[in-house]
Amino acid sequence: MSASSTSSSSTSCPEGGEPSGSCKSSDEGESTLKKRMQQYGIASGYANSSISTLDRSQYQSLPLNGTRRVTVQFGRMKIVVPWKESDQTVGQLADAALLRYKKARGMANEDRIHVHRLECASDGGILDMDDVLEEVFDLNYDQILAITDEANGGSTTPTYSQIQKQQHHYAQPLPYARKFDGGPSTPIASAFGSVTVNHQAHRAASPYNVGFARSNSRDFAPQPTHSKERRDSVVEVSSFDQIPQSGLRVSTPKPSRQSEDVIDGKPMNQPILRSSLRTEASGSRTEEATPVKQSRVTLSPEVEKKLAEQDERKSERRKHYDKNPGRFARGSDRKSRITDALLDARDRIADQLESQNPAEETKSQMIRVKIDQGPMPGTSLVTFPPIPEKSENEKQLGIEVNAVFDESSELPGTSEPTKLSSVQIMKIEDGGRIAKDGRIRVGDCIVAIDGKPVDQMSIIRVRASISDLAAVTSRPVTLIINRSLESFLEQESSAKPIQSALQQANTQYIGHTTVVELIKSSNGFGFTVTGRETAKGERLFYIGTVKPYGVALGHLKSGDRLLEINGTPTGQWTQSEIVEKLKETMVGEKIKFLVSRVSQSAIMSTSASSENKENEETLKVVEEEKIPQKLPLPALMTPPVPKDTPALSPSGASRFEIVIPFINGSSSAGLGVSLKARVSKKSNGSKVDCGIFIKNVMHGGAAFKEGGLRVDDRIVGVEDIDLEPLDNREAQAALAKKLKEVGMISSNVRLTISRYNECNPGQISRDLSRITVDASSPSPSSRMSSHTAPDSLLPSPATRGTSSSGADSSHSRQSSASSAVPAVPARLTERDSIVSDGTSRNDESELPDSADPFNREGLGRKSLSEKRGMGAAADPQHIKLFQDIKHQRQNSAPTSSTQKRSKSQPRSSSQRNYRSPMKLVDLPTTAAASASTNSQNLDDSDMLNRRSQSMESINRPVESILRGTGQIPTGSSSKVQFMQAASPDQHPFPPGAALLRLKNEESRSRDKSRRKSMGNPFSAMRNFFGFGSKSRDASPEKTPTESVQLRSVERPKSIIDERNNGSSERAPPPLPPHQSQRRGSGGNVFVDYGEPYGLIPQYPHNTTSGYESYADSELYDRYAAHRYHPRGGPIIDEDEYIYRQQSTSGNSPINTSSYVNYGLPASNAYHVGSRIPPQTSSGSISKTSGAMRRVYPAEYDEDVAYHQQIPQQSTRYQQGSGSGRGNADYHHMFNSWFAYTGGGAVGAAPVIKSSYGSSPVRIAAASAIERGESFVVEPVSGSSASATDRRGRSTSSGAVASGSSSTGFQYAAKEKYADARSGKFNGGSTRLFIPRHGGGLSAAAFATNFGGEAYETRGGGAGGSPSQYRRRDQGPPHRFPQY
């Protein structure tokens, strides 16, 4: 019940005049309302008329005559209650209105009509029955709603529970604006919704419908009643069971007021709407004195169809009850829990509940909206048909929506909303158009509203558009839901209980049928049979279970219906007879089974077609009364094809397009599917690519959220690219490339899918073939033979995926997991069975080895973590440069031979002695003196077999070093020799040996840890980018080519060969001391460019870890300070020069030994080049004050013996008679210089100063070196004066006494450059090479031609001194000397 309260009063003031003092009452007992009205009193011509609360402009004046009234409306009847006292309560108003309503209805006072409560329409506030009305209710600007019910149901006034269910969500009741401009007020939705049959009476009186009611004063003017209005009266159908066929006769109550019948010039009562059929007590209207007349009833086709179906069901029930009077009789129907009687009883109970609940019945009889396929795949188009005039609530959709934002493609993963993509339904209100349809669910997303895309609007505009749809009644309105059309069909069966496969297939309908021939094995057929009887007495038999390793596995399924066995229908047998017949079958005997399979989707489409005829075709299922034996599958059993199903291809597969939106708008995560490639192998052995198929849809991926892809779907196109004519490799490449391109410009991708026409994965597909199963063994891989037969339809499930290229082909499926694109690196095959047509074929085919497109490192095959830069793709080990470095390191580890040594190969002698403080080589003891030159031919790389002793062991005696390492046992002779048998007083590193510095143990462990860290990607990354410690293979000077290939270094030609144009053959060079086997090759010493970290390319097999340069050349001062024991003499004094007594030989002239620094001199003797002690003929030592300590070189008999065999070399080798300088140890001098330059910086070469010259000879003359020039000093005949250097220090005759008896050359103090080809200065030359420096440290090579040209001693006369190695006297100690 709604009560619209208005109040009116009269005043004695003139019309249109201002209130005067006489008009004001001085009575203090008047109510506050009367006082307010007197204050604003204005004369009005509507003193005794009803003023509607819809138009606030009507309140121009309020008569203050002390009389007011409240109009209370009960349905279509309005009751006027006089309101005189100002202190009356709300309960008194309710009682007075109810009393007058009963009296007008002719009801007795004892008839129960209960008023629950009164509410304010503006804010829904509940009025207390004991409160004074004027204190809690605004009579001018508010309205009272009375919530009532009637015991006999005769009133159409809604109950409170109905109103609560039908409250509109969007617009809550709001008070009207207090303005008197006559403009339209804000429309507010009605709280009554679509509850009553006649809503037009409420629409005019309710403030919620102001937007649809006109606010003119003529709306309420008295108008005559026409007969047309009476003919359009409301027709109410109280029962569907007894509907008169000749039309309905209705009684129209006489209106109590003219304003009740006509509002806005239109009749208030409208024709019946099928959405508001209600049972209303028509007896209450028949009591009226108004004469009745005929009215025509118009029912929609949907309602007529529903009524016809109800009549048909009732007639069937009556026949059934006549046949079976007991509902749950213990008969044949009780053998199974799921019987027709039980289902019919459930339907009857449901019908009774629906009849008891009119609201649910009305909901079930509502016209459903039309749902079609949307414009985009995965969407549905919902069309709301135009509706006649209804109440406001029936026009509203009745939904609450919330915004769904699309994340920015530039910032994937961000949570900041950027663009509105759709709106999601959060709540569905009862009574709205969507709630009455019932198929749109909470959570569905709306992407378009009446043709307007949501992504082009704001959320406020979207909500306004949804509200504006209520005003559109002349045309249909549409919504596009982001949900596939199939989901609406599946929703119909969602409320049904979950049933097993047998329960789902337990039906009388005949589905897809096939003939299966099984050969019985020793374990039977491998399935069980279950059966039931219908209410008509029919016997139905089904496949109960299929054993895992039985014959029927893969051919029969639980729930399949057995129609025939060997052509005999099973309906004439009992279950025990069928089981007995199967048991009587002999092993190896063949039996034909005609089975039928019904899918759940077909059942759902059948039920959906009865309720939504516009959306899909009615599924026609024909039940066979008797199946012919000769025709196991009649044409009537062809499965139905829905009207909206895409066109079928010749191979029986449907093609359609689907749009898959990427997750977060980016294609980096892929589609979320794993793909497989199928290859068909023909009987002739050829292979045919069958395309790319969906293997699995990953949970949570883009394809999973879209819901349109299924397993075994074939991808035949992507965007505008057709993949069908391409092979598997080309299709994979095209798909990956297109996905990458589309991901950059779009947030979704369009795929073209080909799908076989199957209802579910387990359905038996149709084909023109019979199946023969040879089940001689229970092995799951049974043999099948295919027979071409026109009267059979279905192949084996094993051959279901055969391509259209040939019926005799079988598939081998190549599969691999991927998040975006297909890849088949592993050749996986699925072996279904061996299919033969007379020729044995193996279906385990593989992709060609040459075509391996499904590569893990292929495009699009990387996981999300790898693409984000923290996976294997960002590992430096995958970078080509890093792989080259790693390959270089693995191949640059030196071994004992040029071949790579495996783990099983023994270590070389140099590797076994790695931990020793110095390098020793085990050689057989041979007599060097008796060996010939040709038989003692050693390789040049033998000089690299040695390593220098550590810095700590340099100052130790040789014996202690050797015995400390255990290589020279105590009291036994040593078998370990330094290239030759050496006496104990010889230095372990004699002249002529290469100086290789031993790496310490710490660096070795570091290298070992670096090799271990190669497997760690973070360590590898750190080392690769230079954050970690350097590896010995990471030297920038060492190119990968040098580490793999062994470069051949062309030895420089001899200067004498260039001068003589190769006319004379040079003799081999003199052997170094202690190395009579040292050299037998052609005569030149070539340059060795050492590497600071790696091996020497020329000698990769003679060292295990290469050089290790020292940080500072000053470390070699200790090496220079070390004193070697002379062969023949002891150390006389520390402050004296150390020299030795030369041993003499009868065949060789042995003179006074020359002396040379075996290392760097002490720092205080750097520039004391003139303090050279005199040397007597007797070999005694003359003491000189402040003289620099030097070491005399050893003179070896082997050298003399060697040069006696080479007469042409003796003269040049021994420069002058009696001079020991000819046998000077230049090898050891080179080692000293080598050690010095190896520890210095770039250009830290020493200065070679001749004892006979006045100026030093710099080895840094790069230009002269490149031109082949050398530094020579020309002798001056007859000159005996002592030469001086640049600083004026005396260097005469190499510090040999002037009275020396030894003979030698005398030189002038003049230095010049001489061309090496000119042959000046005794035809000799000295050629120097610039050392190659790497990383500031390098091993330099100083080569002197001592083949055809002997060494230049640069000494003069007997007792003359050889060259001296010294530092430069000026400039930085580690800088290259500058000119």
Swiss-Prot record:
Entry keyword set: Cell adhesion, Cell cycle, Cell division, Coiled coil, Cytoplasm, Developmental protein, Differentiation, Fertilization, Gastrulation, Gonadal differentiation, Repeat
Coiled coil: 606-626
Ranges of Low complexity composition bias in the record: 1-23, 776-786, 798-826, 894-912, 1290-1301
PDZ domain ranges (all copies): 381-483, 515-599, 659-750
Region feature (Disordered): 1-32, 208-335, 767-873, 887-918, 949-1085, 1273-1301, 1350-1379
Subcellular location: Cytoplasm
Tissue: Asymmetrically distributed at the periphery of the zygote and in dividing blastomeres of the germline lineage. Coexpressed with par-6; patchy expression observed at the periphery after completion of meiosis I and in meiosis II. On completion of metaphase II, expression is restricted to the anterior 85% of embryo length; this decreases to 55% in embryos between prophase and telophase of the first mitosis. During the first cleavage, expression is detected in the advancing furrow.
Entry superkingdom: Eukaryota
Broad class of where this protein is predominantly found: cytoplasm
PROSITE patterns the record matches: PDZ
Comp. bias regions, Polar residues: 239-256, 272-284, 967-977
Gene Ontology molecular function: any one: phosphatidylinositol binding
Compositionally biased spans, kind Basic and acidic residues: 302-315, 322-335, 828-844, 854-869, 1030-1040, 1048-1060
Biological process terms in GO annotation: asymmetric cell division; cell adhesion; cell differentiation; establishment of cell polarity; establishment of centrosome localization; establishment of mitotic spindle localization; establishment of mitotic spindle orientation; establishment or maintenance of cell polarity
Presence of the UniProt keyword Zinc in the record: no
Entry-linked InterPro entries: PAR3, Par3/HAL_N, PDZ, PDZ_sf
One Gene Ontology cellular component annotation held by this UniProt entry: adherens junction
Keyword DNA damage annotated: no
Family: Belongs to the PAR3 family.
Cited function: In cooperation with pkc-3, required for establishing cell polarity and regulating spindle orientation in the early embryo. Localization is crucial for recruiting par-6 and pkc-3 to the peripheral apical cortex and restricting par-2 to basolateral surfaces. Necessary for apicobasal and anterior-posterior asymmetries associated with cell adhesion and gastrulation during the first few cycles of embryogenesis, and also for epithelial cell polarity in the distal spermatheca. Regulates the asymmetric localization of csnk-1, ppk-1 and gpr-1/2 during the first embryonic division.
Quaternary structure note: Required, together with pkc-3, for the localization of par-6; par-6 is involved in localizing/maintaining par-3 at the cell periphery. Interacts with par-6 and pkc-3 for localization at the periphery of anterior cortex of the embryo.
PANTHER family referenced in this protein's UniProt entry, alphabetically: BAZOOKA, ISOFORM B, PARTITIONING DEFECTIVE 3 RELATED
Protein name in the entry: Partitioning defective protein 3
Organism expressing this protein natively: Caenorhabditis elegans
